[in-house]
Amino acid sequence: MAKVYTCFCTDVIHEGHLNILREAAKYGEVYVGILTDRAMVCFNRFPALSFEERMEIVKNTGLADHVVAQDEILYDKVFETIKPDYVVHGDNWKEGPERMIRGNVVDNLKRYGGELIEVPYTYNETVKKIDARMKEKLAMPEYRRRR
């Protein structure tokens, strides 16, 4: 069976993530990488939930065959260890800071073989509000200190 890889850098699983997982399942056995706390801080922000909690949330969707740690933003180690046939990601990484990560995936796919499948980004007002509240909460040092 083909190996399908996607990676999440999130505390909340929303409609867009579920769309990605459902699309990934069409192509084979789904591996979901969860960025470790260190990787999230380096890339995006301080996580609101622990790494273990974030892994459990993805497992509980029932849409992932394997949930694994992704220690780095770039996918080199993913390709060395999992050797995915497909990488599935939202198409929101074509521009902005994530463009570099996409380039890394494309380079690895050329090297190892495989295909990139980009799912149309899910724009949702509820998700925007959740993200804004999370960023606001994480801006408070007393909250971060409890972690």
Over which residues does each language-model region extend?
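Nucleotidyltransferase catalytic core that binds NTPs
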Residues: 1-147
